[in-house]
Design a protein with these regions (language model features):
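N-terminal membrane topogenic signal
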Residues: 1-12
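Membrane-interface transmembrane-helix boundary segments in multi-pass integral membrane proteins
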Residues: 4, 47, 161-197
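Alpha-helical transmembrane segments of multi-pass membrane proteins
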Residues: 13-31
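Non-cytosolic membrane-interface motifs at loop->transmembrane helix junctions
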Residues: 36-44, 75-78, 102-115, 138-140, ...
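Interfacial helix-start motif at the membrane-water boundary
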Residues: 41-56, 181
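Membrane-interface helix-boundary motifs at transmembrane edges
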Residues: 67-79, 131-139
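Alpha-helical transmembrane segments in multipass membrane proteins, preferentially the mid-helix core
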Residues: 120-136
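Short, highly charged, low-complexity non-transmembrane loops/tails of multi-pass membrane proteins
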Residues: 203-226
């Protein structure tokens, strides 16, 4: 299972890095052509939750291959669970809300497919294969911190440039629709986080039972040989 987890992490690392670099090239080039400065174009690129979530997944995958002690925190199940929750959210929000609003063109299609479907699927697959059943419900509280910080960043940026990256976060929607949308996203995030924790516990327990069964089978086989 450990080897399979590393293979999946490697696939997530390669595909995620490729799509992030390609999307960076597309976004920054188009943004600067539209009159933004280089700094403004880069900030615009990083204003999307999809990009930040994929960066988190990329770092989580990369940490699995680097032996440095200071990266141990990035290899914890809690950090992996936070990245997995964010990536599953990316896939769900995109497929349910954003994708129906418009189809990307050209190279952006490839980036959209990888960043919104392939990398989230690989992240979830890695989470299941590497499950240990040791993630606590308390971890969910910490998993809510990054999206809360992101939300603060969105509106601090909006205060200065009057622009948000996602239409359902636009203050122009009106207070009621905006707050309803934010509440819905928070509720979906909490539900997704609980699902991620439940999957870890369920698969972890199943692995434990299989391990005990194999140990018992080996022990019984040795006794018969005696």
């Amino acid at each position: 299972m450990k080897t399979l987890a590393l293979i999946i992490a490697g696939l997530g690392l390669v595909s995620g890095a490729f799509a992030l670099v390609l999307q960076y090239s597309i976004t920054v080039t188009e943004a600067m052509a539209g009159g933004r400065s280089l700094a403004g174009a880069v900030l615009f690129y990083f204003s999307f939750f999809t990009i930040l979530a994929n960066c988190a997944a990329l770092i989580s995958h990369l940490a699995q291959f680097l032996p440095f002690k200071f990266l141990d925190v990035l290899r914890t199940r809690s950090v992996g669970g936070a990245a997995t929750t964010a990536m599953v959210m990316v896939a769900m929000v995109y497929s349910l809300i954003l994708a129906p609003q418009g189809a990307p063109q050209g190279e952006s299609v490839l980036c959209d497919v990888i960043l919104h479907y392939i990398t989230p699927t690989l992240m979830l697959a890695w989470w299941l294969v590497s499950a240990k059943g040791k993630v606590s419900l308390q971890s969910l509280v910490w998993w809510l911190v990054p999206p809360a910080v992101y939300l603060a960043f969105v509106y601090i940026r909006w205060f200065f440039v009057q622009e948000v990256s996602n239409p359902f976060l636009d203050p122009a929607l009106g207070q009621y629709r905006l707050l309803s949308g934010i509440f819905g996203i928070v509720l979906l995030f909490v539900t997704t986080g609980l699902m991620v924790i439940l999957l870890d516990k369920s698969v972890g327990k199943l692995k434990g039972r299989q391990g005990r069964y194999r140990s018992s089978a080996r022990y019984a086989s040795r006794r018969r040989l005696r």
